[in-house]
């Protein structure tokens, strides 16, 4: 079990201008034990410079751009650094790390929070939305992971989704890429066993992205999902940090996510560190024999009814 320390770290967060990424940044720059108790350096990354500046204002700490930090003579006072970078471009990620090395800011933890979903039926998606799903949800993570490992970053944190365990209608632009993240994590754990590699599967949490998703989400998708009571981004973040401190590296943030993960073990998934692993493996086997087949028949019937109602309109 590899330890987890929230202090004295250099932490890079992609997708740090909003949502869960911003919440992590806010947590990691706080002086919980009095002024000066926190010695973290936090770098938030996003494509939009203006969003990063606004995020710094919401976090409540004076942020400094990475370009300015490189030439800053009073670096010890700086906790929060921001940098505009399109992490879907490998060259731009590599260039960012050159600046980090020059600034003596090689990360000890990298949080790959960038991502987003546009829930629609497959044929309703535009070519741009399809490509955006690939670049935002996979390319951003694979580029950042590749460059991070080249610089011997000791802890990588990937962010997948509960739909990686159970992809269903309406998530064609999102779920396949989040499943790809899970596959990538399994391979990297084999190739880089000395590196701590965490994969988080968050449930719904309140964010700008969550509100936008509900605008385009098909009715059948909402029906299968059922009613949702999203937690705050801070609650989701604290659950993840608590799990990390326990040494867990396959992390869900609610009971539904844990049950879905229990039902989807399979090859390369038995050496992972998850909550109540042995019990989840047994429970998952029982659910796959009993409950899952019945539930999938119900889903099939829901989709059939939805299609029939749609055709009669």
From Swiss-Prot:
Its EC number is 1.1.1.102. It is a single-pass membrane protein. One of its GO terms (biological process) is sphingolipid biosynthetic process. It catalyses: sphinganine + NADP(+) = 3-oxosphinganine + NADPH + H(+). CDD domains: KDSR-like_SDR_c. One of its GO terms (molecular function) is 3-dehydrosphinganine reductase activity. It is found in: Endoplasmic reticulum membrane. NADPH binds at residues 15, 17, 19, 47, 51, 86. It is an enzyme of class 1 (oxidoreductase). Its main location: endoplasmic reticulum. InterPro entries: KDSR-like (IPR045022), NAD(P)-bd_dom_sf (IPR036291), SDR_fam (IPR002347). The active site is at residues 160, 174, 178. Gene3D superfamilies: NAD(P)-binding Rossmann-like Domain (3.40.50.720). One of its GO terms (cellular component) is endoplasmic reticulum membrane. Pathway: Lipid metabolism; sphingolipid metabolism. NADP(+) binds at residues 12, 20, 86, 174, 178, 207. Signal peptide: none annotated. Keywords: Endoplasmic reticulum, Lipid metabolism, Membrane, NADP, Nucleotide-binding, Oxidoreductase, Sphingolipid metabolism, Transmembrane, Transmembrane helix. The chain crosses the membrane at residues 278-298. A motif (GXSXG) lies at residues 15-19. It comes from the Eukaryota. Catalyzes the reduction of 3'-oxosphinganine (3-ketodihydrosphingosine/KDS) to sphinganine (dihydrosphingosine/DHS), the second step of de novo sphingolipid biosynthesis. Belongs to the short-chain dehydrogenases/reductases (SDR) family. This is 3-ketodihydrosphingosine reductase TSC10. The gene is TSC10.
């Amino acid at each position: 079990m590899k330890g987890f320390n929230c202090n004295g770290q250099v932490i890079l967060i992609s997708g740090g201008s909003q949502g869960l990424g911003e919440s992590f940044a806010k947590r990691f720059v706080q002086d919980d034990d009095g002024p000066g108790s926190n010695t973290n350096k936090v770098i938030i990354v996003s494509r939009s410079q203006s969003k990063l500046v606004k995020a710094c204002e919401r976090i409540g700490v004076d942020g400094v751009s990475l370009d300015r930090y490189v030439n800053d003579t009073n670096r010890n006072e700086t906790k929060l650094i921001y940098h505009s970078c399109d992490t879907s471009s490998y060259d731009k990620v590599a260039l960012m790390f050159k600046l980090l090395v020059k600034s003596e800011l090689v990360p000890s933890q990298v949080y790959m929070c960038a991502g987003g979903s546009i829930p629609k039926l497959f044929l309703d998606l535009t070519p741009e939305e399809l490509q955006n799903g690939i670049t935002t949800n996979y390319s951003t993570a694979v580029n950042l992971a590749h460059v991070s490992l080249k610089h011997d970053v000791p802890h990588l944190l990937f962010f997948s989704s509960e739909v990686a365990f159970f992809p269903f209608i309406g998530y064609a632009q999102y779920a396949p890429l989040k499943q790809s993240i899970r596959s990538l994590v399994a391979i990297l754990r084999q190739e880089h066993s000395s590196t701590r590699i965490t994969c988080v599967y968050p449930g719904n949490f309140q964010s700008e992205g969550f509100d936008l998703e509900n605008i385009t989400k098909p009715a059948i998708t909402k029906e299968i999902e059922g009613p949702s009571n999203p937690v705050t981004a801070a609650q989701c973040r604290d659950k993840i940090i608590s799990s990390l401190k326990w040494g867990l590296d396959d992390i869900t943030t609610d009971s539904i996510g844990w049950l879905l993960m229990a039902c989807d073990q399979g090859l390369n998934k038995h050496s992972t560190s998850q909550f109540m692993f042995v019990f989840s493996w047994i429970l998952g086997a029982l659910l796959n024999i009993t409950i899952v087949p019945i539930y999938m028949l119900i889903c099939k019937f829901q989709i059939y009814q939805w299609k029939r109602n749609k055709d009669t309109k």
